[in-house]
From Swiss-Prot:
The record marks D71 as: Transition state stabilizer. It comes from Thermoplasma acidophilum (strain ATCC 25905 / DSM 1728 / JCM 9062 / NBRC 15155 / AMRC-C165). It comes from the Archaea. The gene is hemE. This is Uroporphyrinogen decarboxylase. GO terms for molecular function: uroporphyrinogen decarboxylase activity. Belongs to the uroporphyrinogen decarboxylase family.
């Protein structure tokens, strides 16, 4: 069994596994070759393109796992939502809640949902033996995309809905939660080895807001998936309360704002940790210094995966990233 599969399942392993969020992205020459002739939507509609872009970091960078090339808005079409990708903006939901009301957010029916990304997962599994990670956005993060034109990054509109339209908020969050569970099961059936939830904007919530308005839904997702696949929960800017989340995730993926040594001491030994290098420093020699500190701080844990604390930047130098991977792999356990 490879180091990633061993680490995420809690088995002994002889080297620290490494992968990066957004490793199949704009910093790679192979990705940019596709982008020169195809839009994002066209790329994500081709299983063969998805497989190629997904696997390239394994070959080029030497990471220990691939993450399927997709977007967190991918399954929203199965809820009756129309998503467009705009240059320099990203995904925009045309029939968002502010325009069309919560009735626009339909119940997700897995029996009628088909997407090229699911076929791509199956194709990837047929072609390659290395670990493959599936994913979905967290429910409140997805809500930030469907509530208005463009993403509500600071959750201003989401918070207004939480407080002034709580029943509507609960109805939408329940539908998103049900969809995420079903979409995860579809990815598991197609062949992914682990599943990560991206709650990128959770840090805009206070600890109390998260506990009351978000945690019950995230908890339900992770509980439903428990035992069927190793799970990773990623959030950013949550340093003040991530150790107290008490979620049934197998791993917490943390950002660079959290001290690894302190966090490791605060959570149960059976929980895994993933992270947490600042992606902005990857191109500099200083990244190796920071990586050594992170790895040393996590050295007492059996379940640890090296990663950045958020997605890689388009300016990332592939050769510098490869050097970082080689360095982490060289650390003696």
């Amino acid at each position: 069994m490879d180091p990633f599969r061993k680490a995420i399942k809690g088995y002994d392993h002889d080297r620290i596994p490494v992968w990066f969020m957004r490793q199949a992205g704009r910093y790679l020459p192979s990705y940019m070759k596709y982008r020169q002739r195809m839009g994002i939507e066209e790329m994500m509609s081709s299983p063969d393109v998805i497989v190629d872009v997904t696997h390239d970091p394994v070959d080029r960078i030497g990471v220990d796992a691939a993450i399927i090339f997709a977007d967190i808005t991918t399954p929203l079409s199965g809820m009756g939502l129309r998503v467009r990708f705009l240059d320099s903006v990203g995904p925009v939901v045309e029939n968002n809640i502010e325009k069309s009301g919560i009735s626009a957010v339909e119940e997700f029916d897995p029996s009628s949902f088909s997407h090229p990304v699911l076929k791509a997962i199956s194709k990837y599994r047929e072609r390659y033996a290395d670990p493959l990670i599936g994913f979905a956005g967290g429910p409140v993060t997805l809500l930030s995309y469907i509530i208005s034109d463009g993403v509500d990054r600071d959750l201003f509109r989401v918070k207004r809905m939480m407080i002034t339209e709580e029943k509507a908020y609960q109805a939408v969050m329940t539908r998103l939660t049900d969809m995420i569970i079903e979409f995860a099961r579809m990815q598991i059936s197609a062949g992914v080895d682990a599943f990560q939830i991206f709650d990128s904007w959770a840090g805009y919530l206070s600890p109390g807001e998260y506990e009351h308005f978000v945690k019950p839904y995230v908890y339900d997702i992770l509980q439903e998936l428990s035992g069927s696949i190793p799970t990773i929960y990623f959030s950013t800017m949550t340093s003040s309360y991530v150790a107290d989340m008490d979620l049934p995730a197998d791993f917490y993926s943390i950002d660079w704002r959290i001290d690894m040594k302190r966090f490791s001491a605060e959570i149960p030994d059976e929980k895994g940790i993933q992270g947490n290098l600042d992606p902005a420093i990857v191109n500099y020699d200083y990244a190796l210094h920071e990586a050594s500190k992170i790895v040393e701080a996590a050295s007492g844990r059996d379940r640890y995966i090296f990663n950045t604390g958020h997605g890689l930047l388009p300016s990332t130098d592939p050769e510098k990233l490869k050097r970082l991977v080689e360095y982490v792999h060289s650390v003696n356990l």
